[in-house]
Amino acid sequence: MSKNRAASIRARLKNRSDAAKQDFNLTLTHYGLERLLYRLSTSKHAPNFLLKGALLFKLWYVVPQRPTRDADLLGLGPDDIDSVAAVFRDLCVIEVDDGIAFEAGSVKTKTAEIRKEAGYGGGGACRTARDAGRCAALAADRHRFW
């Protein structure tokens, strides 16, 4: 990824954010999440995940929904923290010329008892993304489905 490409993408995102009167940090976060999801879609892990939550609604509806700063994923397969971390580290090393570099070493995971009464848990992963002059943490939650 060239610095000029990253700077160009950042400038276009700034213009889009200004035109929509949207918080620029939210625009950058959404772009980062979308690029993370792109990497997931091109990876060997793609068949094991489904997008859900507010980010999905953003794709379906023209009417703005509540702002979200993470991606909610329904995951199939192992849900132990080490497996979740390995998936996100794999995604971080996929190179795409989109102005973002994800840092595999920055992946941090957490366990969560999500809907414990329903019999499934989950976990989350957070990683650092860098673009032209900006570093941000992006989060994704993975929920287990049986």
Predicted regions and their residues:
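Compositionally biased terminal segments of proteins
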Residues: 1-146
